[in-house]
């Protein structure tokens, strides 16, 4: 069985060395999970991102070391779709994503819908997200 990338649309210029990811088994045990909890602009208009691990113990910033760990697959970073700092109209996007990703695992009507958006490193652009095969830098994605 061939290993598959965690995001099926991953292009060759999207850097990710590890092949396990959020849609392959229980990803919580494969990599440290972080969430972007705040994305505010400073006085100069530069985006200031705040990360919190899934354990919720401390607040961090995306350092070059964390980006290297993301590329190596040691950590995974997500944005919750309820994040108030998102600039894109997520109400429309989530409806489309729910229609696309709803899976009835046990055939009893119990369904899972995507509520976390994975963040990845795109060579030349930096940290990015992908919605409907369109790549947004975090600078474009947040207000």
Swiss-Prot record:
Residues 1-15 have a biased composition (Polar residues). Keywords: Electron transport, Photosynthesis, Reaction center, Transport. Residues 1-24 are annotated as: Disordered. The keyword Electron transport applies. One of its GO terms (biological process) is photosynthesis. Component of the P840 reaction center. This is P840 reaction center 17 kDa protein. It comes from Chlorobaculum tepidum (strain ATCC 49652 / DSM 12025 / NBRC 103806 / TLS) (Chlorobium tepidum). The lineage of its organism: Bacteria, Pseudomonadati, Chlorobiota, Chlorobiia, Chlorobiales.
């Amino acid at each position: 069985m061939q290993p598959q990338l965690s995001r099926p649309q991953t292009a060759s210029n999207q850097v990710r060395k590890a092949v396990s990811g959020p849609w392959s088994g229980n990803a919580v045990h494969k990599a440290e999970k972080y969430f972007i909890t705040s994305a505010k602009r400073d006085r100069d208009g530069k985006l200031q991102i705040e990360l919190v691990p899934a354990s919720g113990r401390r607040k961090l910033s995306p350092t070059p070391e964390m980006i290297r760990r993301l590329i190596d697959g040691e950590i995974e970073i997500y944005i919750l779709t309820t994040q108030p700092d998102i600039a894109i109209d997520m109400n429309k996007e989530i409806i489309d994503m729910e229609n696309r990703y709803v899976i009835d695992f046990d055939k009893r009507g119990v369904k899972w819908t995507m509520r976390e958006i994975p963040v990845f490193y795109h060579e030349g652009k930096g940290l990015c997200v992908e919605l409907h095969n369109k790549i947004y830098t975090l600078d474009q994605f947040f207000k």
